[in-house]
Each structure stands twice: as structure tokens, then as C-alpha cells.
């Protein structure tokens, strides 16, 4: 049962081949057996899962149906879950039980999804390797000595190891797409505002977006259907109708214009990855797509702009964790200032502290114009480059990452080296565009992803292109040895 996709599970439940309770028990046993190898979960919710599965089976018995009804999933541990620890991978929130469900959690629960647990992540979603979690690093099921990507590494590793068919994740600078690439999954970052951020603990509010991680585009369509939609509780949520993503997976790629930015294939890209990306392009050409070279001239400025804007927003968002209202509080503070300093110093890890410092510096009186304002101007240029490109093409294609997954600890002492791994993904966050990563092959036994970007609210187009590609390739069906 553990090898089934979400779509296969939906068919199996509808045909009464097994019950949601049976499936849930099977996967919980598998998690208990295998997760100690990869450390993908922070919290397991066995009792909740079994009660939700039982309720889903009863709903089916009463004639209800639905692709997510009785389907097991997990949530990245920054989505608030009522009465269940929501840690954000941090000592700071190790004791925090949210008083309410995030909109994404509530919507999926209403659709009948079964929550198996909360997945590990880089602390406060800051990282590209899932090594900054207070609960320990997550290991890549394809090679346990390598990182799974971050910050949604727990969700990615759990799905890749077949512990469950799909999971929620978030993407601020590539945190869905990069782990998807590193673990041979399909991951989608929706348009900014497509999925509610209410109850999703913020890292950088103008960049964060929730989305699905699964093995196939078909499964991403099912999970996104349950996550997307307008939410009046989120002031950045956009009131745009949500199409039927699964029904849209049947479109022909004949005449589809795919833009390939020349900047993507400059120095820094592993030549073996470049070859796999070119193979993907040939496959899409066979399906009728037309390839056109384009330019994104301001892409080279994206990383410095992102690493000013994101930490600046983080320094503001994380100021609420002060040892007073909720979260970690130091012992025996001498006075209020000591309480603040020690609670934050002891509660936050080194990467989070680094980004808070960078952000506070960029926002300080003497440097605001030089850094933050300039970064926002670059953000506008990056967005304009995409608008120009999408006048000529329907989709933009390139690598998801410049390199395959690196070894655990390999970039820990050099944060800038890790930041540079985000070069292909952060532009979509700066511009607010939807982006998808799908499996494209392997380098030294490690998975490689190809990234697709589309205009605003064209998630359906991304999913259809990925689905047609997956009907004609088998990379996404490969399973890591031992899982």
C-alpha cells in the first residue's frame, strides 16, 4: 500500500479495496519502522490520524466521495495545528501548541485528509539543507549521507521514503522546489496569494507561500485543490476562482512555447545537470512544444536582493518571540532586558540569529536606502524581466538547482555557498510567480529536478506540462533503495 500515489489511493478507497483506517495503520507502522533512519517527523499524531481515518470511512459509507477523503498526509511543522505542537523546527517553539488550525490544515481536514504528523524543517524555514532544525538534520532517502534540501526537507524525505503519499510544504526562496529536486519528487510553489498564509508561521511575509509536495503532478493537483482558495483571514490572499486542476491535466502540449533563459546555463551549473535539462527539453519537443531562447538579465542580482529582503522581513516577524507571550523563556532572568536577550539567544539557532542580524542591519536608519530600498528596486526589475518573457513564451524552463544534494555538513561552515544554491528558485518568490520542480534524472545516484515557471495563477498549466512529461518518462517512479 505504501507505494501508492494519492490518485491510486483515491481509486482504491472508492473501490473499497481497503479502508482509510487500514491504510493509516499501515503507514503509521512504516513510519515507526523507517523514520529513525531519516528523521523526517517532529511529531506523530497517531490518535488524531486514526480518528480522522475512521470518520473518513464513515463519510464514504454514507455516500460521500472526494480525492482527499481518507488520504494520509503530513504537515510541515510551521502550519498551526490546534492542540498539537507547532515547533517551526526551533527550540523557541518546542513547547508551543497552537490554539487554532491554519487555514490550510482546516481546509484539508474538511476535505477528509488524514494527518499522520508534523514534518521536520529548517529552523523557522531558514535553510536549504534541513540541517538547522533543533530536532536534528533530516537525511536524504536516496543517500543517507546527503541532505534532502530545505527548508521543507522533512516533508520531502517522508514522501520520497514512501512513508506517506504527499505532504504540505512552504516555499520562500525554493523550499518546496529544491527538496523536490533533491529527493525525486514533484513540488509546486503556487502564485503568491493563491494559498492562505493564515496560521502559517511567517519567515518572510511577502515571499512565503504554501504548496504541495508529492511524487507526481497528478498528486500535486489533488493536494493543491484542497489547499488553494481565497481566505478573508489573510490580507494577501487573492480572490481568484480556483480551477479544477485534475480536470486540466489532459491538455496537449502542441505549440506550447517554452522559454529557456540563456542565463541559466552559465558558470556554476553542474554540466551533468545541464545535460539532463537538455534531455527534458527534447522530451517536451517530442510532445509538440516549441523551444525559444530568452533572457532574464537581472537574474544575477536576485540572490543579493533576496538575502536583504527575506532577512529584513524575518527580523520583524521574529521580534514577537521575546520570552514573554509564548515560546521559550530563559530561567531566572535578572531583568526584562536579560529576559529578552537570553530567551532569544538560547531559543534561536545560529542560522536564525544570523538572518535576524542581517535583516536588522539592512533596515537600520543609515543603511535602509542603501540595502533594503535598493533590493526592492531589483525585485521590481526581476518581475519586469518575467513579464517581458511571458509576452513571448507560455512556460519558462531550466534547472531547479545548480548541483545535486551535497553531503551533510558540507556547507555548514559557509552559509554563502548554501545561499548560492537558491539561484534558480528565488526569482519566482521575488516575482510572486508559480513554479514547479519535477524529476529529470540522476547524477551519481542522486536525483535532479527540472523547474517550470508560469504566469500568475497558471498553476494548471504547470501541472499539465509536468503530467504530460511524466506520462512519457519514468524518473518519478524510481524508488530509493531500502524504502
Curated annotation (Swiss-Prot):
The active site is at residues 76, 151, 175. GO terms for cellular component: glutamyl-tRNA(Gln) amidotransferase complex. Gene3D superfamilies: Amidase signature (AS) domain (3.90.1300.10). Pfam families: Amidase. InterPro entries: Amidase (IPR000120), Amidase_CS (IPR020556), Amidase_dom (IPR023631), AS_sf (IPR036928), GatA (IPR004412). Transmembrane segments: none annotated. Its EC number is 6.3.5.7. It is an enzyme of class 6 (ligase). The keyword Ligase applies. GO terms for biological process: translation. Keywords: ATP-binding, Ligase, Nucleotide-binding, Protein biosynthesis. GO terms for molecular function: ATP binding; glutaminyl-tRNA synthase (glutamine-hydrolyzing) activity. It catalyses: L-glutamyl-tRNA(Gln) + L-glutamine + ATP + H2O = L-glutaminyl-tRNA(Gln) + L-glutamate + ADP + phosphate + H(+). PANTHER family: GLUTAMYL-TRNA(GLN) AMIDOTRANSFERASE SUBUNIT A, TRANSAMIDASE. Belongs to the amidase family. GatA subfamily. Allows the formation of correctly charged Gln-tRNA(Gln) through the transamidation of misacylated Glu-tRNA(Gln) in organisms which lack glutaminyl-tRNA synthetase. The reaction takes place in the presence of glutamine and ATP through an activated gamma-phospho-Glu-tRNA(Gln). HAMAP family: GatA. Heterotrimer of A, B and C subunits. This is Glutamyl-tRNA(Gln) amidotransferase subunit A. The gene is gatA.
Amino acid at each position: 500500500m505504501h507505494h501508492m500515489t494519492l490518485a491510486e489511493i483515491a481509486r482504491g478507497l472508492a473501490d473499497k479495496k481497503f479502508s482509510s483506517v487500514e491504510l493509516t495503520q499501515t503507514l503509521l507502522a512504516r513510519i515507526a519502522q523507517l523514520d529513525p533512519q531519516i528523521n523526517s517527523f517532529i511529531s506523530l499524531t497517531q490518535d488524531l490520524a486514526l480518528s480522522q481515518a475512521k470518520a473518513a470511512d464513515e463519510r464514504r459509507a454514507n455516500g460521500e466521495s472526494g480525492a482527499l477523503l481518507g488520504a494520509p498526509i503530513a504537515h510541515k511543522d510551521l502550519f498551526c495545528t490546534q492542540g498539537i505542537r507547532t515547533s517551526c523546527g526551533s527550540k523557541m517553539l518546542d513547547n508551543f501548541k497552537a490554539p487554532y488550525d491554519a487555514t490550510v490544515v482546516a481546509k484539508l481536514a474538511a476535505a477528509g485528509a488524514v494527518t499522520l504528523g508534523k514534518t521536520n524543517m529548517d529552523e523557522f524555514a531558514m535553510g536549504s539543507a534541513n540541517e538547522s532544525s533543533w530536532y536534528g538534520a533530516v537525511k536524504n532517502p536516496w543517500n543517507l549521507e546527503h541532505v534532502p534540501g530545505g527548508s521543507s526537507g522533512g516533508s520531502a524525505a517522508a514522501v520520497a521514503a514512501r512513508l506517506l503519499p504527499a505532504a504540505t510544504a512552504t516555499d520562500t526562496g525554493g523550499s518546496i522546489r529544491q527538496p523536490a529536486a533533491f529527493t525525486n519528487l514533484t513540488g509546486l510553489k503556487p502564485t503568491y496569494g493563491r494559498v492562505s498564509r493564515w496560521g502559517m508561521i511567517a519567515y518572510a511575509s511577502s515571499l512565503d507561500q504554501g504548496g504541495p509536495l508529492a511524487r507526481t503532478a497528478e498528486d500535486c493537483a489533488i493536494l493543491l485543490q484542497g489547499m488553494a482558495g481565497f481566505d478573508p483571514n489573510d490580507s494577501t490572499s487573492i480572490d481568484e476562482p480556483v480551477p479544477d486542476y485534475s480536470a486540466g491535466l489532459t491538455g496537449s502540449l502542441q505549440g506550447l512555447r517554452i522559454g529557456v533563459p540563456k542565463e541559466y546555463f552559465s558558470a556554476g551549473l553542474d554540466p551533468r545537470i545541464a545535460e539532463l535539462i537538455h534531455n527534458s527539453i527534447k522530451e517536451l519537443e517530442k510532445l509538440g512544444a516549441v523551444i525559444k531562447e530568452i533572457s532574464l538579465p537581472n537574474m544575477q542580482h536576485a540572490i543579493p536582493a533576496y538575502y536583504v529582503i527575506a532577512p529584513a522581513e524575518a527580523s520583524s516577524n521574529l521580534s514577537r518571540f521575546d520570552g514573554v507571550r509564548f515560546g521559550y523563556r530563559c530561567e531566572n532572568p535578572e531583568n526584562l532586558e536579560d529576559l529578552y536577550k537570553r530567551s532569544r539567544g538560547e531559543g534561536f539557532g545560529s542560522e536564525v540569529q544570523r538572518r535576524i542580524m542581517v535583516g536588522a542591519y539592512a533596515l537600520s536608519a543609515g543603511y535602509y536606502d542603501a540595502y533594503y530600498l535598493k533590493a526592492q528596486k531589483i525585485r521590481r526589475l526581476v518581475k519586469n524581466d518575467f513579464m517581458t518573457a511571458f509576452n513571448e513564451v507560455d512556460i519558462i524552463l531550466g534547472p531547479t538547482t545548480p548541483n545535486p544534494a551535497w553531503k551533510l555538513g558540507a556547507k555548514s561552515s559557509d552559509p554563502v555557498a548554501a545561499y548560492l544554491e537558491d539561484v534558480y528558485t528565488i526569482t519566482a518568490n521575488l516575482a510572486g510567480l508559480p513554479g514547479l520542480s519535477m524529476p529529470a534524472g540522476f547524477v551519481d545516484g542522486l536525483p535532479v529536478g527540472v523547474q517550470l515557471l508560469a504566469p500568475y495563477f497558471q498553476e494548471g498549466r504547470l501541472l499539465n506540462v509536468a503530467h504530460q512529461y511524466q506520462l512519457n518518462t519514468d524518473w518519478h517512479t524510481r524508488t530509493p533503495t531500502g524504502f
